[in-house]
From Swiss-Prot:
Family indicated by similarity: Belongs to the radical SAM superfamily. RlmN family.
InterPro entries reported in the protein's UniProt record: Aldolase_TIM (IPR013785), Methyltransferase_A (IPR040072), RlmN_N (IPR048641), RNA_MTrfase_RlmN (IPR027492), rRNA_lsu_MTrfase_RlmN/Cfr (IPR004383), rSAM (IPR007197)
EC number: 2.1.1.192
Binding site for [4Fe-4S] cluster: C111, C115, C118
Localisation: Cytoplasm
Reactions that this protein is recorded to catalyse: adenosine(2503) in 23S rRNA + 2 reduced [2Fe-2S]-[ferredoxin] + 2 S-adenosyl-L-methionine = 2-methyladenosine(2503) in 23S rRNA + 5'-deoxyadenosine + L-methionine + 2 oxidized [2Fe-2S]-[ferredoxin] + S-adenosyl-L-homocysteine; adenosine(37) in tRNA + 2 reduced [2Fe-2S]-[ferredoxin] + 2 S-adenosyl-L-methionine = 2-methyladenosine(37) in tRNA + 5'-deoxyadenosine + L-methionine + 2 oxidized [2Fe-2S]-[ferredoxin] + S-adenosyl-L-homocysteine
Superkingdom in the source lineage: Bacteria
GO molecular function: 4 iron, 4 sulfur cluster binding; metal ion binding; rRNA (adenine(2503)-C2-)-methyltransferase activity; rRNA binding; tRNA (adenine(37)-C2)-methyltransferase activity; tRNA binding
Keyword 4Fe-4S found: yes
Protein name: Dual-specificity RNA methyltransferase RlmN
Disulfide bridge map: C104-C345
Organism: Delftia acidovorans (strain DSM 14801 / SPH-1)
Length: 374
């Protein structure tokens, strides 16, 4: 069996090297070559013994995901569409800013949560990504951007957010080794504060992540009460808001930051009224023993045809943000980036899936016609 070495964190790679009869320090060397230097050719790895390089050539590989398309926005945002096979594709987005470079990474092909305002959720769920498929997005983005920008080997991506396609905590087994590789000083060397997992609220896995790999946490809240959140985020029927907020408080005991970020997609006439802001204020004040324990990130909705939803007017978003801020809650409004390259997460991948399904339908129709010919 030929093994993709992107599928391992350092401990996993060490175990693999031991199976080959090698010492652990060889895994550390190999890990650095892969993740810090972006090497995919074992012959490039000059400090590895030739005997090990020959072993690896026979049983392993370092393979990124095929890139279907790359779109570069006028504001510098880059979106890649990666082929994960079976007619599925996933997206990763690089967002450059003055003081950081953030990569938004996907964890699943499709998503089973089915949030009403999410383009990915409307596609349905295909499968979980492997650890290697998650890391391959970072590996490709980091090293292709280094070459393009001519950084001389300096790191381009300073922050990773698991906010692409899929619910990360429903792919827990693959997620945690990927996070560990991002944090490892022999890998990407990112701090726990600079890696964020965004979840729609898988309560048991929030608790588990706090013990296994506590990074920064963002929660897709989007509503101040269960009645409103149930149809927007169907997972809320299983883990209602009070259970979710309890889990957030428990997570803070282990988190690298002293706050949870609540993401709140602003939907015209749905969840953007002053009464909704006041309900959020009540939720926040009921917890935290008077201390500041969360912040809100208000997100302008990226419309797509199947949603039946509209973006809240800018003036209403400003008013909503002011109500929260005046109550002492740190509140930001996310800048829209990459509007000219299909900004809504999942739209490009959805186009691929739609074309694949159309081709399959045409193939079935041709088969039926051929069978009917006497």
């Amino acid at each position: 069996m030929n093994t993709n070495l992107l599928d391992f964190d350092l401990d996993g790679l060490a175990a693999y090297c031991e199976q080959l009869g090698e010492k652990r320090f060889r895994a550390t060397q190999l890990f650095r070559w892969i993740h810090q230097r972006g090497a995919s050719d074992f012959d490039q790895m000059s400090d590895l013994a030739k005997s090990l390089r020959e072993k690896l050539k026979a049983c392993a590989h370092i393979t990124a995901l095929p890139v279907l398309t790359e779109h570069v926005s006028a504001d510098g945002t880059v979106k890649w569409l990666f082929d994960v096979g079976g007619g599925d594709a996933v997206e990763a987005v690089f967002i450059p800013e003055d003081d950081r470079g953030t990569l938004c990474v996907s964890s699943q092909a499709g998503c089973a949560v089915g949030c009403r305002f999410c383009s990915t959720g409307h596609q349905g769920f295909s499968r979980n990504l492997s650890t290697g498929e998650i890391l391959a997005q970072l590996w490709y983005a980091e090293h292709s951007l280094r070459k393009r920008l001519g950084t001389g080997g300096e790191r381009v991506i300073s922050n990773v957010v698991m906010m692409g396609m899929g619910e990360p905590l429903q792919n827990y087994t693959a997620l945690v080794p990927a996070l560990r590789a991002m944090l490892d000083d022999h890998g990407y060397g990112l701090s726990r504060r600079r890696v964020t997992v965004s979840t729609s609220g898988v309560v048991p896995m929030i608790d588990r992540l706090s013990q296994d790999c506590a990074v920064a946490m963002a929660v897709s809240l989007h509503a101040p009460n269960d009645e409103l959140r149930d149809p927007l985020v169907p997972l809320n029927r299983k883990y209602p808001i009070h259970e979710l907020l309890d889990a957030c408080e428990r997570y803070l005991e282990f988190a690298p930051r002293d706050f949870i970020t609540f993401e709140y997609c602003m939907l015209d006439g749905v969840n953007d009224q002053p009464e909704h802001a006041r309900q959020l204020i009540e939720l926040v004040r009921a917890r935290g023993d008077g201390r500041s324990w969360c912040k809100f990130n208000l997100i302008p909705f990226n419309p797509f045809p199947a949603s039946g939803l509209l973006r809240s007017p800018a003036a209403r978003v400003t008013e909503f943000a002011s109500l929260l801020s005046n109550a002492g809650i740190v509140t930001t409004v996310r800048k829209t980036r990459g509007d000219d390259i299909d900004a809504a997460c999942g739209q490009l991948a959805g186009d691929v899936k739609d074309r694949t399904r159309a081709a399959e339908r045409m193939a079935r129709q041709r088969t039926i016609v051929l069978k009917q010919v006497p």
